[in-house]
């Protein structure tokens, strides 16, 4: 659920929960740039409206608004906010979030080209675009890391890079959908 209107976002969160969603992925409000305290109020209201676990989605390149590490720390104290899809592309920021939040906030990579660097900072996985085309590659990369085979994880991360470039030559999800149309990947569908 995502909205730049908190009331509308709360309605979407509640409806998602009522329809059986297990969790909410909540993107930062786009277009209307709020303050960091405004982000706390926005995400808190949406989490409470949904009443189910929340993963924050930080993608400032798309929304124009970044969740600061200190804001992530404050939000991690909410009992329903237990994760962040970190797609800022700033590994230093990810390190600071990890240092501030510890085990209170599960960090997931939102950038397929930074899976292993993020895992090395204590990340729990990736919410991936590449996995729509090569799910086994992304799975095996994460599995290798968690199995302690960092050399294999690094090798698979590097193998992903050309695919990352191809999948982001246009705005997502255009390349993924195109690949499904020409039968290079499984057809995309709602999950």
Please place each PLM-identified region on the residue numbering.
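Residue-level detector of conserved catalytic or cofactor/ligand-binding positions
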Residues: 180-190
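Alpha-helical scaffolding segments of alpha/beta enzyme cores, especially the outer helices
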Residues: 8-19, 38-49, 70-74, 92, ...
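Conserved functional loop/turn residues at catalytic and ligand-binding sites
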Residues: 20, 50-53, 79-80, 122, ...
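Active-site beta->alpha loop and helix N-cap motifs at the rims of alpha/beta catalytic domains
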Residues: 1-64
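Catalytic alpha/beta core domains of metabolic enzymes, predominantly
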Residues: 62-168
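Generic leucine side-chain signal with a strong bias for well-ordered alpha-helical environments
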Residues: 25-26, 56, 75, 119, ...
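C-terminal substrate-binding/catalytic lobe of Rossmann-fold NAD(P)-dependent oxidoreductases
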Residues: 169-174, 180
